[in-house]
């Protein structure tokens, strides 16, 4: 029995805008391979968004109105007309739209990134290019909101992950390029008397856990932004309990390129012994397609990294025999295997000790101990080599370790929130779990709802799941480990409709939060849980109460929620998601009420299934 608690006396957020999602307005757009939704499919997809009462849809948007052949703007061309239909469907469904006015900074302004040639670009003239971009931002308000009445467009997202190198920079830092473009857009809107028609959101920093650019933006762009935002993803699965020793952490990796390391000093011409405890599991046996796990002492070139500085692969060994490539099929997936190597440091006075996860198929690796010792000496040179102080002292990249992912989501969002100017809203503008790219897996619903509950509890004004549906990017044929399959970005809770009308299990979990937790004006009250069992409470402007409980583990759990303030005998309708009994079908209906808890006062007791999500609400179906 778990004891949960909700502080329903003082809200952590008094104006929650809802659990939204990235949902691009691609439905019906032309495609060079004919992968185009029919009108019926366009309607089905939009109706699903409306049925779940999706609060915010953030969409890709570019200079589709530009006619490159005539060098003129045509706001009624084929693509814009199709996009208007999507916007109208969103408006009819009560969905607020956030337009990404520019995706790549500065590449969309100076034509130096994957979106190609931009109509804003004046070769060699950043200032004029930037102004042309800003004029387009303002014209978008005139054409879409004022002239055509799409008043559900309420937010402009100022680029995507602009801290990255998304283009060739005009002798400026990524931060400066983004800030100058955002300032230009703000000033153009002010100039045209349109600033009150739209909110500017940024910087959309990601995928980082530190929100360093958000911190910078709060100090350098606060006069331009209405909503602050940043994000990250859960790259690593929660560590199974069988790997964990009480009082210590285990670091895990599941994406090729994941690694952790630290720089240490060496004595020249000294014999060393390096060892690592590893557990790993993969889905393939052929070493040529599986890849390897690299461990050892790598050259210190000033980067504090075990990844090569050029291309892909491990860095250079610091000495002969100082690194090893490990076939993951040769070590156990059930317990840790110790891998040891010996080397002489030669002329080296330092090295980078660490592990590089280069498993190319689906798989994982876990580590609970790294040691580097002089031969005959029992002192571990690696700082915090047993992870008793979590990962302090280690540089990590797509490598982490947690038993309860809720704690990570909460910490990541709090990190961003601490930098947001007082009284200003913060949106966690992308999230999902990426350690398993197949979103049909039974635990995905609980995993994303676990994140949503954490983001609500820490005080975010809104959050955006990447993405609500799988989506075919027009004229795109990308295949990569970021879930693109021939341009079909498979990140959603339902496949593209020309693959299947049947959604994933996670659709039925997420739609409960989306439908029964209201938007604008909703109050969020923080819940307190433990052992991967968490809760939160929302109260709508009209007084409707919704309590959410998520069990993000593989065991059934019983619980009692204690409310700090008596609920005064309300009746709560239960909506019960159990991935073991939920059967997805083409109807994609929201899970209805299966039980009513009558006269709820200061406690509520129930049982929740493994990876289950339960919503208790005063709302009627």
Show which residues each predicted segment covers.
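Glycoside hydrolase catalytic-domain groove-lining segments
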Residues: 236-241, 398-435
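Carbohydrate-binding surface patches
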Residues: 529-570, 575, 611-617
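Aromatic/acidic polysaccharide-binding cleft in carbohydrate-active enzymes
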Residues: 428-534
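Conserved, mostly hydrophobic/aromatic
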Residues: 21, 140, 156, 228, ...
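Substrate-binding cleft and catalytic face of glycoside hydrolase catalytic domains
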Residues: 49-240, 270, 281-287, 347, ...
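Mature N-terminal, pre-catalytic/accessory segment of carbohydrate-active enzymes
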Residues: 1-47, 52, 355
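C-terminal beta-strand-rich structural cap/linker in extracellular carbohydrate-active enzymes
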Residues: 592-621
């Amino acid at each position: 029995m778990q004891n949960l608690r909700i502080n329903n006396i003082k809200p952590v957020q008094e104006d929650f805008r809802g659990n939204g999602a990235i949902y691009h307005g691609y439905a019906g757009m032309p495609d060079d391979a004919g992968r185009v939704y029919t009108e019926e499919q366009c309607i089905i997809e939009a109706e699903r968004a409306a049925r779940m009462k999706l609060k915010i849809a953030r969409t890709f948007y570019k200079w589709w109105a530009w006619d490159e052949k005539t060098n003129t703007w045509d706001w009624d061309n084929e693509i814009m007309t199709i996009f208007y239909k999507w916007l109208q469907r969103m408006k009819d469904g009560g969905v607020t739209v956030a337009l990404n006015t520019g995706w790549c900074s500065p590449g969309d302004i100076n034509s130096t990134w994957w979106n190609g040639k931009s109509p804003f670009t004046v070769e060699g003239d950043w200032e004029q290019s930037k102004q042309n971009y800003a004029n387009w931002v303002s014209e978008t308000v005139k054409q879409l909101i004022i002239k055509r009445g799409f008043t559900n467009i309420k937010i402009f997202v100022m680029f995507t992950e602009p801290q990255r190198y998304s283009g060739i920079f005009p002798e400026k830092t990524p931060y400066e390029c983004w800030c100058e473009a955002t300032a230009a857009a703000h000033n153009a809107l002010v100039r045209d008397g349109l600033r009150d028609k739209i909110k500017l959101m940024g910087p959309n920093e990601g995928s980082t856990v530190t929100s360093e650019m958000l911190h910078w933006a709060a100090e350098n762009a606060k006069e331009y932004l209405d909503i602050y935002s940043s994000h990250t993803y859960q790259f690593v699965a929660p560590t199974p309990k069988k790997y964990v020793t009480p009082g210590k952490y285990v670091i895990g990796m599941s994406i090729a390129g994941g690694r952790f390391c630290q720089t240490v000093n060496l004595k020249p011409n000294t014999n060393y012994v390096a060892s690592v405890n590893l557990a790993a599991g993969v889905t393939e046996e052929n070493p040529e397609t599986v890849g390897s796990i690299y461990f050892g002492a790598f050259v210190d070139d000033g980067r504090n990294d075990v990844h090569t500085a050029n291309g892909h692969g491990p860095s250079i060994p610091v000495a002969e025999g100082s690194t090893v490539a490990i076939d993951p099929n040769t070590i156990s997936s059930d317990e840790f295997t110790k891998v040891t190597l010996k080397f002489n440091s030669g002329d080296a006075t330092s090295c980078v000790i660490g592990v590089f996860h280069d498993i190319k198929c689906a798989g994982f690796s876990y580590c609970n101990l790294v040691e580097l010792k002089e031969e005959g000496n029992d002192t571990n040179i690696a700082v915090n080599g047993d992870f008793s102080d979590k990962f302090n002292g280690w540089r990590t990249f797509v490598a982490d370790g947690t038993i309860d992912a809720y704690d990570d989501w909460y910490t990541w969002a709090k990190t961003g929130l601490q930098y947001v100017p007082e009284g200003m809203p913060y949106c966690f503008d992308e999230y999902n779990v990426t350690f398993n790219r197949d979103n049909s897996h039974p635990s995905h619903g609980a995993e994303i709802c676990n994140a949503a509950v954490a983001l609500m509890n820490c005080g975010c004004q809104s959050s955006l799941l990447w993405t609500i549906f799988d989506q075919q990017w027009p004229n795109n044929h990308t295949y990569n480990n970021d879930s693109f399959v021939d341009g079909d970005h498979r990140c959603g809770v339902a496949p593209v409709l020309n693959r299947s009308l049947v959604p994933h299990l996670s659709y039925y979990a997420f739609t409960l939060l989306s439908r029964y937790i209201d938007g604008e004006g909703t109050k969020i009250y923080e819940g307190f849980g433990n052992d991967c069992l968490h809760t939160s409470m929302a109260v709508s402007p009209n007084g409707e109460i919704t309590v959410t409980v998520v069990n993000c583990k593989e065991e059934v759990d019983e619980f009692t929620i204690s409310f700090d303030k008596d609920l005064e005998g309300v009746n709560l309708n239960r909506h019960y998601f159990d991935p073991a009994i939920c059967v997805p079908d083409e109807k994609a209906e929201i899970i209805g009420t299966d039980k009513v808890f009558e006269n709820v006062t200061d406690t509520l007791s129930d049982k929740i299934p493994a990876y289950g999500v339960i919503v208790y609400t005063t709302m009627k179906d």
